[in-house]
Amino acid sequence: MSEAAPTSWRSRAVRLVGNAVAVAGIVFVALTVRRHLAALPPLQLSPSLSVSIALGVVANVVAMVLGAWTWRTLLAAAGAPISWRSSFSIVGRANLAKYLPGNVFHIVGRAGLAASEEGLKLPLVLATMTIETLMIIAIAVALGAPAAVSQLDALRAMVPAGPWLLLGALGLAVALVVVVAVVLRRRRVVVGSVALAKVAAADVVTCVLLGSSVYALLATAFPTTTMPWSICVSGFSLAWVLGFVTPGAPGGVGVREAIFLLLAAHSTTVEHPTLAAAFSAAIAATVVVGRLQSVVADVIVFVVARAMAPAPPQGRVATIK
């Protein structure tokens, strides 16, 4: 019997760092929940509103499932297929780190887990994640364009650089597409148009689903709202992408809510002062509850993904010659 083979110190280091990031993410999530609960306006929970809130959480969970599916689709197209279980487990555990300051730790976490658990090369992981990110940004910008055009003055009032951020996001997306294409071609990795079409379709479903959940919440909290569903979905997509590209906004917290709040307020006309005040309160409650729905969904996905994670190596493994 030979000497026992020690567990890779790199694998242990990655797991320790991953656990530390996960714990830090949980702490920041708790702080986020506390801050949003404190900002929540008085809200009377009716059965219909409770159902809307629950369905919003489900919609956010489904969005996470679709996100894991799109990454797995890109990996398979690039010649590095992994199981659905692994894809969901890696994405779900790493996602919680997006609430850490810097807004990059979920990317680092996913790359580390993919390397340590699936043996995927870092350039391939980063390339597929870059394509995934560019696709969702492009789809969100396309869906958010109607809201941006119709509420351009309001957008400038809230975020003076907002239009430039959108143009910058598009320019960066185009530049990165070229860079990623060159890198993949040099490595003889080709992601076909079919895979890209699947990812684009999933991204459209994600944006429409999440935007619709916000609309359902607003319509339930304020039944007489005149905000069109299409503008709500478009406004959500616009707020999402601006929150994503705003530097230093962990998980887009604060930025997305503020932008959607402004767009919703300017896209709806309520003449009666009392109704106007009620509508403003309903919008405020909607954006706060919407963020809480997202946080709760992220925690649920993290718990499930953690349970699905492979067991860590048991230190030393005996081998027989």
Residue spans for each PLM region:
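Predominantly cytoplasmic-facing regulatory/coupling regions of multi-pass membrane proteins
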Residues: 1-92, 140-142, 146-248, 255, ...
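Juxtamembrane transmembrane-helix termini in multi-pass membrane transport proteins
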Residues: 72-75, 111, 126
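A generic structured-segment signal
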Residues: 83, 94-99, 108-109, 124, ...
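Membrane-interface alpha-helices at helix entry/exit sites of multi-pass transporters
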Residues: 85-89, 103-108, 115-133, 272-289
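Mid-bilayer segments of alpha-helical transmembrane spans in multi-pass integral membrane proteins
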Residues: 95-104, 133-145
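Re-entrant/interfacial helical elements at transmembrane boundaries that shape
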Residues: 104-117, 249-266
